[in-house]
């Protein structure tokens, strides 16, 4: 597709696709606006993690009720709670003490690596750090809610063929 020109805008803000003249957006969210079409692409699993040096001077965290005693780094869309569950327990909101927020997951990742506190981050972003023990998983027996990465667009009726082909390409690529 050498004739296709990309204009890529990277933001974690929810923009009006029509007003911003965006053909397709990729969003990680539990739900999109009813006025948009969302094509689910994959599930995004998040984990709680922290730098080992941040945790070493603190009491061992064994239950989410303790999160309020720790510095927490969170996405700006989160309230003052994190929702966690186990196999035996329904999702429950636990209060957290927010010391830093960002609308960018990579910025949150760097804050976590810089020993600023505990963060809830997509596993795909922290996988290498967890394997290398640069970061360690916290409360590993608890799960964060699954989010969905979706291709989001305004209407099938007016979706340009090149956009349809691009979405099909992304879907095919993610299957590999």
For each of these PLM feature ranges, what is it?
Residues 139-176:
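A late-sequence structural motif
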């Amino acid at each position: 597709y050498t004739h296709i020109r990309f204009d890529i805008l990277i933001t974690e803000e929810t923009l009006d696709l029509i007003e911003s003249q965006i053909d397709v957006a990729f969003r990680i969210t539990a739900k999109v606006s009813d006025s948009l079409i969302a094509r689910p692409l994959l599930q995004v699993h998040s984990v709680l993690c922290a730098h080992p040096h941040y945790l070493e001077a603190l009491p061992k965290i064994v239950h989410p009720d303790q999160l309020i005693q720790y510095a927490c780094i969170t996405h700006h869309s989160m309230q003052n709670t994190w929702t966690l569950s186990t196999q035996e327990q329904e999702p429950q909101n636990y209060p957290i003490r927010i010391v830093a927020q960002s609308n960018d997951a990579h910025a949150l990742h760097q804050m976590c690596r810089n020993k600023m506190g505990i963060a809830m981050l997509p596993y795909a972003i922290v996988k290498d750090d967890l394997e290398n023990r640069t970061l360690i998983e916290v409360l590993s027996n608890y799960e964060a809610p699954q989010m969905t990465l979706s291709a989001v667009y305004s209407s099938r009726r007016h979706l340009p063929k090149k956009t349809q082909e691009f979405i099909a390409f992304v879907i095919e690529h993610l299957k590999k």
